[in-house]
Regions:
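N-terminal Rossmann NAD(P)H-binding glycine-rich loop of SDR-like oxidoreductase domains
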Residues: 7-29
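Rossmann-fold scaffold of SDR-type NAD(P)-dependent oxidoreductases
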Residues: 12, 79-88, 129
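Conserved glycine-rich Rossmann-like NAD(P)H-binding loop of the short-chain dehydrogenase/reductase
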Residues: 30-43
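Conserved residues in the N-terminal Rossmann fold of short-chain dehydrogenase/reductase
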Residues: 38, 65-66, 106, 198, ...
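Conserved Rossmann-fold cofactor-binding substructure of NAD(P)-dependent oxidoreductases
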Residues: 63-84
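Hydrophobic/aromatic anchor residues within beta-strands of the central parallel beta-sheet
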Residues: 64, 104, 165-168
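Conserved Rossmann-fold NAD(P)-dependent oxidoreductase catalytic core, especially the SDR/UDP-sugar
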Residues: 87, 91-151, 155
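Strand-loop microenvironment adjacent to phosphate/nucleotide-handling motifs in alpha/beta enzyme folds
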Residues: 121, 151-172, 179-349
Length: 349
């Protein structure tokens, strides 16, 4: 963590699952300060008390800023002294964004523009924007707004001065706030049907720790304008539900198929065919560099890419597919699941 020694890191949307994972990873390191920037004072107060109890000797490294990425001035107010930013603030629930698309635009699109504008003005060293697989070939409002977020990040990276701007794309982060596994656990414990949308639907899966690893990889190895993804495995929703049933004593016959929700796909894409054609293989990750050609139309129309026709997209149907036992092992290794199985219960990320 020496690259963060004495530095100030700001996390937008910092009271969420990702912000908690970063705090647990960083607080006992030599980092100077972590700023939690968010709009919910109750969540900030809960977080303040939690970390004062958990890490009393280092909790003073956490500083809380009430603000909203939708408001440029509140972003500017939080920037003085910030060295790096992890931009995690987002509206991410697919059905909610379908019904309120302009709210998704305000947070995911305009909010990102505000954060990046304020960061560039303040001379912040690096901003890592957290995106989603739903931004590739988007069909729903959440994915479309996150795709525009990425476009804004790449566009601003061309004129960002000393500020490095990168994006990371995630699949499903297991047991993050609003995800399905905690819902299934509650359904099993309450004796209710275990609801899933479509058994054959596939999703990339990763842990919160892997989510933090991806952001740190982008921070250390990404170049200005890059999009970085992890080579994540996938599983079907049916396999995931059965794994949770086996871990928590649920009955597979209690699984109830309720149908695909508003805006959902049968499978998700982490890299499009076009992105795969120029992606750099970096071991456990892919790096997609920005297309930094200018608006020289003659050159733009004459430069082609034959490689594009020879390659597939990277999606949750053609990546490595976890079987039931592999899925169960991956879920069972999560800290959230360990605490739930130990009887502590109601463990909130």
């Amino acid at each position: 963590m020496s690259i963060f020694a004495g530095k100030t890191l700001m996390i937008t949307g910092g009271t969420g699952s990702f912000g908690n994972a970063v705090l647990n990873r960083f607080l006992r390191t030599d980092i100077g300060e972590i700023r939690i920037f968010s709009r919910d004072e109750k969540k900030q107060d809960d977080m303040r008390h939690e970390y004062q109890a958990k890490y009393p000797d280092v909790a003073n490294k956490i500083k809380f800023f009430i603000g909203d990425v939708r408001d440029l001035q509140s972003c500017r107010n939080a920037m003085p002294g910030v060295d790096y930013i992890f931009h995690a603030a987002a509206l991410k629930q697919v059905p909610s964004c379908e019904f309120f698309p302009m709210e998704a635009v305000k947070t995911n699109v305009i909010g990102t523009d505000h954060v990046l504008t304020a960061a560039i003005e303040a001379g912040v060293g690096a901003v890592i924007c957290l995106s989603t697989d739903k931004a590739a070939y988007p069909i729903n409002a959440m994915g479309i707004t996150k795709a525009i977020e990425e476009k804004i990040a790449v566009a601003k990276s061309r004129y960002s001065g000393k500020t490095k701007i990168c994006c990371t794309r995630y699949g499903n982060v297991m047991c993050s706030r609003g995800s399905v596994i905690p819902l299934w656990i509650d359904q099993i414990r309450n004796g209710n049907p275990i609801t899933l949308t479509e058994p054959k639907m596939t999703r990339f899966i990763m842990s919160l720790e892997e989510a933090v690893d991806l952001v740190l990889f982008a921070f250390e190895h990404g170049q200005n304008g890059d999009i970085l993804v992890q080579k994540a495995p996938a599983c079907t929703i049916q396999t995931q539900a059965e794994a949770v049933c086996e871990l928590f004593g649920g009955k597979k016959e209690d699984i109830k198929v309720i149908g695909i929700r508003h805006g959902e796909k049968m499978y998700e894409t982490l890299l499009t065919k076009e992105e795969c054609a120029k992606a750099e293989d970096m071991g456990n990750f892919y790096r997609v560099p920005a297309d930094n050609r200018g608006l020289n139309y003659d050159k733009f129309f004459k430069e082609g890419d034959t490689k594009r026709a020879e390659i597939e997209e990277f999606n949750s149907d053609n990546t490595y597919r976890l079987n039931l036992q592999e899925t169960k092992a991956k879920i069972g290794a999560l800290e959230y699941i360990k605490k739930e199985l130990s009887g502590e219960g109601n463990f909130v990320q």
